[in-house]
């Protein structure tokens, strides 16, 4: 029997004291703050893990939103500078080229190994020519085409791109995808056919120019997918040389576009006025053409007051959508990107009805846009089902009929059976 004050009692009392001191430390303010910070860190880490797991879907949603904003602000920018469309396009291309140059310099300073990677520039020569045709036609067409009509006419790119990918890339499509393309086009055209109350400036000639721009754009999209899926793809060099060729080709297009004049002097005068007055319009908001002009006349009156602010916002949204486009192309396809962009048809209509977004380019919105939206979503779902069917058929063709282990076992059993039969026959005839 132990006495009081023995070593065991002392050790027990000391351990209980230690336990009490540990509990008191666990409830200290500093420990609570540490636990709170750890909890916040784990929550943020879990959120980032969830975002990373859903990154493709999030990028697709951002792509649609940015696509809507880019379309709206492009139309607003053209509306404010419609008398200087070709100079406006040159300013946009040159701005993006400067941004890519800055990115290239940073990559050269901090990631030289990436910049040393080989990249074939030759395909971009033809791509730049196609981009020049597409940009020039769409820019001149959009000058007198309403914002919503731009989006609806642009949906012809979906079947044209599918045809281009089939001819150039030999891509296979499921019949569901062809049906979905027809559904999307039907609901895209439903809006302008049934709703003729749009009072914005729409000229048939400009509508046709914008429609024709889809032909070179669809061919360029198919060739661009070939570039993106190449193992030698270099995103920085691709953007650098792409904008460079596009810029010089667009100068050629501008020179050809301003040719129909009576004299050489008039030709160079028109080029001078295009550049100087366009520069004043975009960067200083100066209206040059204010007399003998009107909405139904050629030229229209200048409206350059907010051109520079709209230009900055357009560059911001367009830069962001290019980044999202790269990520989607690396994990998807150009046809999926186009079909994803068709969701913007009703969403753009909503955006054009909101004055704080569309500004002077505001148009009316009605319930027909909801019908178009549901129809386009149905087409997208059918396209996704067709993509799944194609993927299942591809996996079925690529997978072996018999697993390696099973085939090896079957060969072994067959060989053993043949050996046993030969031994039996040998025993019978000897």
Swiss-Prot record:
Q: Does the record bear Transmembrane in its keywords?
A: yes
Outline which residue ranges sit on the Vacuolar face: 75-88, 144-147, 195-206, 261-306, 359-364
S-S bonds: 281-304, 293-301
Molecular function terms in GO for this entry? xenobiotic transmembrane transporter activity
Its membrane topology: Multi-pass membrane protein
Where it sits in the cell: the answer is: Vacuole membrane
Cross-referenced InterPro entries, in alphabetical order?
CRT-like, Transprt_Chloroquine
Q: Where are the transmembrane segments?
A: 54-74, 89-109, 123-143, 148-168, 174-194, 207-223, 240-260, 307-329, 336-358, 365-385
Specify the glycosylation sites in chain numbering. 195
- Identify the main location: membrane
Which protein, by its recorded name, is this? Putative chloroquine resistance transporter
One GO CC term on file: vacuolar membrane
Species the sequence originates in: Theileria annulata
Cytoplasmic topological domain residue ranges: 1-53, 110-122, 169-173, 224-239, 330-335, 386-430
